[in-house]
Amino acid sequence: MAKAIRRSCAKHLFAQCGSGFNLEQGAYIGNGKKFSVGDNVGLGKNFTYHCRIVTIENDLMMGENVLFLGGGHKHEHEHEDLSIPMIQQGGLPDTPLHIGSDVWIGSRAIILSGCKSIGAHSIIGAGAVVTKDVPDYAIVGGNPAKVIRMRK
């Protein structure tokens, strides 16, 4: 019953919500207006999404405690102006994230704002910290995530 309630809420809150959608307990998605999912998408327990336009195509599997983070603080200059507190040096704009079809994201993976695309048929290893785009058919892992091998 709880899954049906979460699914019903998502269909009303998300920009788009396909059939076969599953949202596990403890997920945080904010207002959902920037969040679109295709068919057969499963978001894992305690999934957290902040500040991004997210489009997920069909057939996504996700483990527990996955984070999609966007925006953030400027890091390209490593907060080099020491006369200004880091918190006052401003943040970065949100960047869209597109996730292709047939993707598996392992537990505790973190997708940061530097990643704008996770390619179709790819696998993100458990605990990976994804800072850059992931090509189609790639298996990535580590911190920062790197291509381990290609599935095809």
Identify the role of each PLM range:
Residues 111-139:
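C-terminal/domain-terminus segments
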Residues 27-37, 42-118, 143-144, 151-152:
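Flexible, glycine/small-residue-enriched loop-and-beta-strand segment within the central core
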Residues 129, 144-147:
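Conserved switch/coupling elements of ABC/ABC-like ATPase nucleotide-binding domains
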Residues 134, 150-151:
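Short beta-strand->loop
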Residues 17-18, 138, 142:
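Secondary-structure boundary/capping signal
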Residues 1-28:
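Extended, small-residue-rich solenoid/repeat segments and analogous flexible loops
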